[in-house]
Amino acid sequence: MNIDSKSGMCLVKVLLILFTFHFSLFTSFAQNADLQKAVAKYKKTTTVTAAATKTSHKDAIAKDVVTKGTLTMKKPADVSISIDGGKDQLVMHGSEFTMVVKGKSHKTSSQTNPQFATFQAVFEYILKGGEGDLSKLSDLAVTKQGNNIILTITPIADSKKAQRRMLFSSFVLTIDKNTSELKALRMNERGGYTEYTFTGHQFK
């Protein structure tokens, strides 16, 4: 009787594990399908422009700094956010990244700086209208919140030293699944975050 009871419990556990696995797999496929549908509009788009608002938040400072600028996204792999007349910029040109902070330029590459590799892959996926496979990116999570698709990139460091050297702990992109608009990009860092919100999108 005890053996049967133990066997039954084991069977229940196995079934629960299988159910959980298949449910999470189904959820993942569904969310990726939602994302693919949300960005399909970009297949027929060469350039996207929008107004940008940058919010810089520091935990130690009570008041956020808010500035204005523009967003330009262009096939095949160009993304440019220019703030305050170009004094602050975030530029992706293929694998090359440039950050301009208060007029000072800093350059890096996704090939030498892995924390930007998935960032590049996600934006290229968007600009290609959902062509490609993001499911193999272990540092990317795709979720749905109301009418929005949320993409969270959490770079994985291979050591504590590498983790300390990371500029950002995570990137969060918000895409409207009905309009295909990139609504926000948030970059979390130690002691604060930088968030860009975008309005007035024009698809050309």
Q: What does each model-identified segment do?
A:
Residues 1-11:
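N-terminal secretory signal peptides that target proteins for export/translocation
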Residues 26-30:
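Sec/Tat signal peptide C-region and signal peptidase I cleavage site
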Residues 33-36, 40-47, 51, 56-57, ...:
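Flexible, processing/modification-adjacent segments and terminal tails
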Residues 52, 79-83, 97-100, 151-153, ...:
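Short hydrophobic/aromatic-rich beta-strand segments that constitute the beta-sheet cores
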Residues 66-68:
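Low-complexity, intrinsically disordered segments exposed to solvent
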Residues 70-121, 194-195:
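An acidic-aromatic
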Residues 136-204:
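Gly/Pro-enriched, hydrophobic low-complexity segments
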